[in-house]
């Protein structure tokens, strides 16, 4: 049923709450797992237009940290004989996830929602909500709460 599973992560423990579910699916269907972290340029509006909040050096460091983090997760899955790949890309998160899903031809996107609501969702947006409205393939989402 599932041959490739895309797992977008953001470096947080809450996002990693999806991993046991992905592990179970990957074992059951002998699926390949693709771990993705999209490093987003943070912009700050100014009177002259928007500018990038991260310096090039800070951005490169963020990408390197993401790669190191994903390599650690990939190693854990390798020890369990689950085939996986990692990608670190940059740009808008939802678009990056959708593009990677198409590029890799995944059968499922699996992620943990941070469960933001209300004013927090207005200011920070919601990757989960963005995917729900734009994704063209099955989506497995679990809600990860602060207490978890």
Regions of interest found by a model, annotated:
Residues 1-53, 147:
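Small/aliphatic-rich secondary-structure junction motif
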Residues 75-109, 146-148:
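Structural beta-alpha unit
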Residues 39, 88-92, 114, 126:
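Short beta->alpha linker loops
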Residues 36, 85-89, 140:
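General small-molecule cofactor/ligand-binding pocket signal
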Residues 16-18, 80, 123, 145-146:
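A cross-kingdom feature marking solvent-exposed beta-strand/loop segments within repeated
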Residues 17, 96, 118:
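Phosphate- and divalent-cation-binding pockets in alpha/beta enzyme and binding domains
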Residues 53-68:
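A short acidic, glycine-rich active-site loop
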Residues 24, 28, 99-148:
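Gly/Ser-rich helix-loop-strand patches that form or flank binding pockets
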């Amino acid at each position: 049923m599932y041959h490739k599973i895309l797992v977008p992560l953001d470096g947080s423990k809450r996002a990693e709450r999806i991993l046991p579910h992905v592990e179970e699916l990957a074992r059951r269907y002998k699926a390949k797992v693709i771990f993705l972290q999209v490093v987003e340029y943070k912009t700050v509006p100014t009177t002259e237009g928007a500018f990038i909040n991260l310096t090039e050096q800070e951005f490169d460091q963020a990408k390197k940290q993401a790669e190191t983090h994903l390599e650690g997760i990939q190693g854990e899955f390798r020890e369990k004989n689950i085939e996986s790949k990692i990608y670190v890309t940059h740009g808008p998160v939802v678009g990056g996830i959708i593009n990677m899903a198409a590029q890799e031809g995944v059968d499922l996107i699996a992620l943990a929602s941070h469960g933001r609501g209300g004013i927090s969702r207005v200011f920070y947006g919601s990757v989960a909500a963005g995917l729900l409205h734009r994704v063209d393939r099955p989506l497995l989402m679990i809600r990860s709460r602060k207490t978890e």
